[in-house]
Structures are given as structure tokens and as C-alpha cells.
């Protein structure tokens, strides 16, 4: 027989005592120590090594292990335990001799019950290990998700910064819970040390006296245990909150990841667009630099021209012509500059048009957002009739969006004002350019007039000089001829010679006077010509200086205008960039707000659909219950009617009975001479009928009371079921799956409908093409028959009934419809409108298809993420 008598139950473990006089009394042992030492070992108990709390933190087995012990002590079964206490040695022999089977049975019962009990210290230790392991796993997951998010987004997104801040907050909360956990550990260790000290004290006490059992209802033990359990519950609740928050963060991470993908695409498109704009702006800057260099080159050319004009003052006529040509070239250059300016103005107009187009695109985007917002508002209005609670929040959001809309409209007005200012500046520059053009035209006309006048004067002077030179030549020739005649006629008579000499002298004097007069006229004309040329040179120099100063002033003004325009261009580029950034931020904020509102509304709509489905199910159940209750009510009413009919029947029977009784009484009174036996018989019959009537009445009353109570219960049950406050909580995963399968089913149905429509269309096309082929074959056969008939006609007969013209069949005339003459008529408005309507419908269908695909992918990822999530 075993030493069951030496064991005693305690809430901590076993106590084994020795019954011999020479054996030392041993200390209380934990199950770990008891397992180390065999029950039959001799000597003092070796203290077992206490296992480390952290030895299973890195083990993956903890996730799948079930709790070894119960969370609480089964006190009811503990009370049923047999109180094994130390028995005096005088009794042991009698118990061992007489009650061995009973002792064996008690031992078995004791071991069964003891296996069901729990060890609170080990349970607490195991729970602490589990919590530590879960905290480490959460820590590792948090670090991995943070690193993944940082690697994916590069730390540029504000959402990532918010998430990092939120993760740091949860890290501090985790540290607080870890500190609380350490505090619980310290409390647990202090409790273990206290228990060990109590064990040591108990061992010291056991050396002098028998071991006492710590009662289960010890107040200190109960208080300590309750404190530990409260701490454990608090820690587990914090851990549950952390786990819920982790699940929310994981869902949020998936949504943010989707948003990051969309933002990445938008960022790439915006960078491409901005690169194109930068390229165009660089090209415009290069063009402006080229124009500036061209202006500088032309300025140098003009200065060189002025220097050459100063150097070539000798040949004035050629200089004037050359200057006029150069001025014409300069005017042509200025015209080219003006054309370039006009091209630049056109380019600026195109840039302004591009800005306006971008503004229109932003306005169209804003209109689309506003349209989506209006659709969303209409949906909200539809839902506000059923859900009054969400009305305040949605109205507040609508007010915020309206404020943002007003701000956006103000910004649009400011941009329009800036565009109007730019247009005014453009008009001013255009008017200045027009003034410059008119001035250049006046200068050109003045120069042409001066040129023509000077050319006329020069021609007149040259003609006068040539006439004078001719006269001088003629005079010299006549003088020479006279000298020759004098020499020839020397031999003539003196008188004739003297007369002739006198005449010739007179002629010579006349000629000399004429030559002097002509010389004086030549000198005066030469002086006038020199004076006129000097005056013209002075005038031309003054005009050239004036034009040079004017050209320099215009050049300086053009340079200033060019610098101002470049500054204005840079300012407009910066302003446009800032406007684009602000618009992108506002659009991004509106998009986020819209997405949040859409997601929130979608969630609310999903919840509403789920609640509606639940309500529909409840309504169907209630309708079925109502139908059943109505059937029961009809049955009860039928029973009541039958009972009332029976009651009326019994009343009539009672009336008949009373009438018979009254008649019998009358007969009895009339027939007093009847025997007493007959009277007694009538009385018995009357009493019997009366008792039956009372029993029947009582039964009917009880049945009516039961039916009324049943009716009240059914009405109360119906009211409870129809109470809208009693509703079951919806399962989000089930709702997501329902939405996913619903969308998949709708897509399949739509696809099948499209295939059916395509099939019908192809069948119609095949039927129509077959019919056309049959008609064409009939026409060809008809033509062949006609050709055969024509071959059989004799040669003397005409070619056809149409007066010798070739045969024109209906088949050939049929294709004349497709000639260019028949296609001169334009398309009708209805055809164009139907085509536009078809395009709009196709666009809407494609947009809805894309949205359904995105929703299906999102639900699929969400369901997979929820199913793959580790559940603790």
C-alpha cells in the first residue's frame, strides 16, 4: 500500500511527511519539486530549479498551446476533497488492516479531483509568458511594418509621418504596459519569495509540530490572489486593446498602401507634365536670349553704321543713298524685331491660353468633384430620411466643403483677375507696338520725301552745270576758230580786218561777258549747292542723331520692357507653380476628404445594408410568426366561436332544461298526489344536470383564460420582435464577403448580358448578310438571263428599248446610291446626338466597370488580410 496517509491537500501542492521517529520532517513541495523527486526517495528534499520566466518567449509553440490549468480554482470540487490529515500512528495499523480498499478508492478519487484543480502560480507564470511572447511578436511586426512603410514611401508622405507619430504613441503605451507587466512580474516574484519564506517558516514549524494546511478561504491568500487576477485581467485587457489597435493599423496600412500607389501614379504624371512645362519654358527662355543677342548684334551694327557715316562725310550723295539703304535695312530689322515681338506676344497669348486651359481643366476637375459631391449629397439626402442621427455630422461636413468651395471660387476669381491684368498689359504693349509702327512709317515716308527732293535738286544742279560746261566749250571752240580765221585772213585788207577785228572783239567781249556771267552763275549755283549740301548735311546729321537717340531710347525701352517681361514671366511661372501646388494640395485634401466620406458612407451603407438584411430577415421571420399567429388566432377565434356556439347551445339546452324543470315543477305542483320516489328522481336528475352545467362552465372559463393569456404573450412577443432597438451586431468580414460576391455576381450577370447582346447582334448581322447575298444572287441570275436573251436577238433589232443605250439593270442602279453624289447630304442632328449619347454611356459603363474592379480588388485584399491575420 502507498503512503496516502502521509499526503495532505493544500492549494499550493503536496506535503509529504514521514511517520518514523528517526525521519526528519520535510518541507512543502511544489509539483515541480515532487516530479523531480520520486515518492519513494529517502532523505531531504532537494530544492528544484525554478524555470525562467523568459525561456519560452522565442518559442512558436506558445501560440498553439492550450492552457494547462483552469483560470480559477474549482472551489466546489475542492470542498468535496477528502481532508487528508496526518493520522496518529496508533490508527494507521487499523486503517491499513481494515480499510485498504476504501483507502485505495479515496486515493483514486483524490487524484482525479486533484488533476482537475489548478495551480494559480503556474497559471500566472504561463500567462505572463504568453503576454511577453505576444508583446515581442507585436513589437517585431510593428518594426517590420514601419521599415516596410519607410522603404516604400521614402518618408515623404504626411500620412507616413502621422503613422510614425501614432506608432510612437503606441510604443509609449506598449512601454507603459511593459512597465505594468514588469510590475506584475515583480509582484509575482515578491509573492513567490513570500511563499518561499512561508514555506521555510512552515518547514521550521513542521520540525516541532504537525503540518497545518493553509485553508482555501484564507483572507490574505484570497486578497493576494484577487489582486494578481485583477492585474492579470487589466494586462490582458490592455493587450486586447493593443491587438485591436494593431488590427486597425493593419487595415489602415493596406488603405494607405493603396493611396500611396495612387499618389505615386499621380506624382509620376504630374512630374512628367511639369517636366514638359519646364522644357517649354526653357525653350522660351532660349528664344528670349536669342532675341536679346540679336538686339545686341543689331545695336553693334547700328553703331558701326554710325561710325562709317562719320568717316564717309566726303561723298555726301553716296553716303545719303547708303544711309538710306542702311536705314531701310534697319527699318526692316525693326520690322523683323516687331514681328518677333508679335510672335513673342502670340507665344505669351498661347501660354495664357494654356494657363486658361489648365484653369478650365482644374475647373472641370472641380466640377467633377462638385458633381460627385452633389451625387454624394443626394445619396446622403436619401439616407437622412431613415437615419436622423447622421444628419448633423453630414451637414457639418457639407458646410466645411461649402466653405472650401467658396475659398476655391475666390481663388478662381483672383486667377481670373490676374489673367485680365495680363491681358490689359498685353493690350498696352500691343498699343505701344502700334505707335512704334506708325512712327516708323512716318519716319520712312519723311526720309523717302527728303530723298526724292534732294535727288531732284541734284539733277537740276547737274543739268545746269552741264549746260554751262557746254557753253564754255562752244565759246572756246569759237575763239579757236576766230584765231584761225585771223591767221588765215592776215593777208586781207586792214580795213576789213579792222572791222572784222572790231566785230570780233565785240563778239569776244560779249562772249567774255557771257562767260563771266555764266561763271558767276556757276559760282553762285556752286555756292548755293555747297550751302544746300552743307545745310542738308547738317540736317541729315541732326536727323541721324535724333534717330540715333530715338533708336537708343527705344532700344533701352525695349530692353526694359524685355527685362520686365522676363521678370513678369518668371513671376508668372512662380505664381503658376505656387498656384499649381496650392491647387494640388487643395485637390488632394478634397480627394482625401471625398475618399474618407465615400469610405465612411460606403461603410455606413454596408452596415445599413447588413442591418437592412437583418431587418428583412427579422421582418420575414416576424411575418411568418405573424402568419402563424394569425393562423393560431383564427384557430382560437374558431374555437371561441365554436365554444360560443356550444355555450349558446348549452344555454338553449339549459333553458330547455329549466323549462322542463319548471314544467315538471308545475306538473309536480299539479300532481301532488305523485309518489315521493318520483320527486326524488326528478331532484336527482335536476342536481345531476346542474353539476354537469357547472363543470362545463368552469372548463370553458379556464379555456378562455388560457387563450387570453396566450394571446397576451403572443402580442408581447410580437411587440418585442418588432422593437427596432433590439438588433444584432453585424460582422464586417461577412459584410465584405457579401459585397465581394455580390459584385462578382453582378459582373458575371453583366458579362453574360453583354455576350447575349453580342450574340443577338451577330445573328442579326448574319441573317441580314445572308439575305443580301440571296438578293444579289437573284439579281445576278436575272442579269445573266437578260444577257442570254440579248445574244439570241437578231442583228437588225435595236440594242434595247431605250433607244440604243446600253442595258442598265436594277442591280447596277442599286450601287449608284453609294456614289459621291448621293453622299452630299450631311448627317442629321439625331444621328450625332445618338452617337454622343452612346459615347457617354460607354464612358459611364467603363468608369463603373473600373470602379467595380477596384472595389473587388480592395475587398479581396481586405478579406485575405483578415483571413491571414494571426489570431491570438
From Swiss-Prot:
Chain coiled-coil ranges? 176-723
Q: What is this protein called?
A: Spindle pole body component 110
Which family does the record assign? Belongs to the SPC110 family.
Subcellular locations according to the entry: Nucleus; Cytoplasm, Cytoskeleton, Microtubule organizing center, Spindle pole body
Report the InterPro entries cross-referenced here. Spc110_C
Gene Ontology CC entries for this record: cytoplasm; nucleus; spindle pole body
Residues covered by region (Disordered): 15-121
> What do we know about how this protein assembles, alone or with others?
Homodimer.
According to the UniProt entry, which residue ranges have a biased composition of type Acidic residues?
A: 65-74
State the UniProt keywords alphabetically: Coiled coil, Cytoplasm, Cytoskeleton, Nucleus
Summary of the function given for this chain in its UniProt record:
Component of the spindle pole body (SPB) required for the proper execution of spindle pole body (SPB) duplication. Potential role in cross-linking filaments or anchoring other molecules. It is essential for growth.
